[in-house]
């Protein structure tokens, strides 16, 4: 269920989803979102909540939408938000969605911020161009058997490799396809950051990330940056 509160808020969120726990592996989603936030990735407030909908009591998962409030909660200033544009997936019926899942471009999701003024327009358009270029490069590289990781920042920036690593460790392959990705552009650091959403995380099952993809995903000298957090 997509919910919008016309008055008041829940933990500052006015737009959020109520999800059936089994569609997000229940507490796996709650724990995964918390782990990512503790590692300073942008991650939505997610928790179990008792609800009464049309007279039916049920346990649901609360998850806030990717909006201004999500950025503020994660100590980021409001800026351009993007996601994979899934329209291509539904345009070619003879192809299965999984075939085109990494052959998409991005789209802006917070158009209200874009319309605030000339500065926000310029920042959004410039970052949009950079992200589109990264999506195209990622699609070409992946088709040639290279890394599947989309890298819209400088090559020395490891944030997207780190995100791919921790998502893979939590069996979140679903959230790594380009069609399911969300991004925030930080104008102060002039760089993109990944936003966690819909990873289909599961800490108990066997890895669902293709071994060949893992083998080609990282640079040879890659090391996960955040191991000290859990030492």
Predicted regions mapped to residue ranges:
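Solvent-exposed loop/turn segments at secondary-structure junctions
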Residues: 8-10, 23-25, 56-58, 67-69, ...
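Sec-exported extracytoplasmic/periplasmic mature domains
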Residues: 36-41, 165-171
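Compositionally biased P/S/T/G-rich terminal and signal peptide-adjacent segments
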Residues: 1-13
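A conserved hydrophobic secondary-structure block that centers on an alpha-helix together
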Residues: 10-58, 126-159
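ATP-dependent phospho-/nucleotidyl transfer catalytic cores
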Residues: 67-169
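C-terminal catalytic region of ATP-dependent kinase domains
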Residues: 117-125, 129-150, 158, 171-172, ...
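A short glycine-rich, hydrophobically flanked beta-strand micro-motif that places a catalytic Asp/Glu
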Residues: 44-50, 177-184
């Amino acid at each position: 269920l997509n919910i919008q509160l016309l008055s008041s808020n829940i933990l500052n969120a006015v737009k959020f989803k109520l999800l059936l726990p089994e569609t997000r592996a229940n507490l796996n989603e709650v724990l995964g979102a918390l782990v990512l936030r503790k590692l300073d990735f942008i991650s939505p407030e997610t928790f179990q909540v008792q609800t009464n909908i049309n007279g039916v009591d049920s346990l649901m998962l609360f998850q806030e939408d990717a909006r201004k409030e999500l950025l503020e909660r994660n100590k980021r200033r409001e800026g351009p938000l993007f996601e994979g544009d899934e329209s291509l997936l539904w345009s070619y019926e003879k192809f299965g969605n999984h075939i085109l899942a990494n052959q998409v471009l991005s789209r802006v999701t917070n158009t209200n911020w874009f319309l605030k003024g000339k500065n926000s327009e310029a920042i959004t358009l410039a970052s949009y161009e950079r992200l589109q270029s990264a999506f195209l490069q990622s699609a070409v590289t992946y088709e040639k058997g290279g890394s599947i990781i989309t890298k819209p920042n400088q090559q020395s920036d490891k944030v997207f490799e780190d995100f791919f690593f921790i998502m893979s460790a939590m069996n979140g392959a679903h959230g790594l396809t380009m069609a399911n990705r969300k991004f925030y552009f930080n104008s102060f650091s002039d760089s993109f950051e990944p936003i966690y959403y819909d990873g289909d995380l599961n800490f108990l099952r066997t890895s669902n990330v293709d071994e060949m993809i893992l083998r080609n995903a990282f640079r040879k000298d890659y090391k996960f940056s955040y191991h000290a957090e859990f030492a």
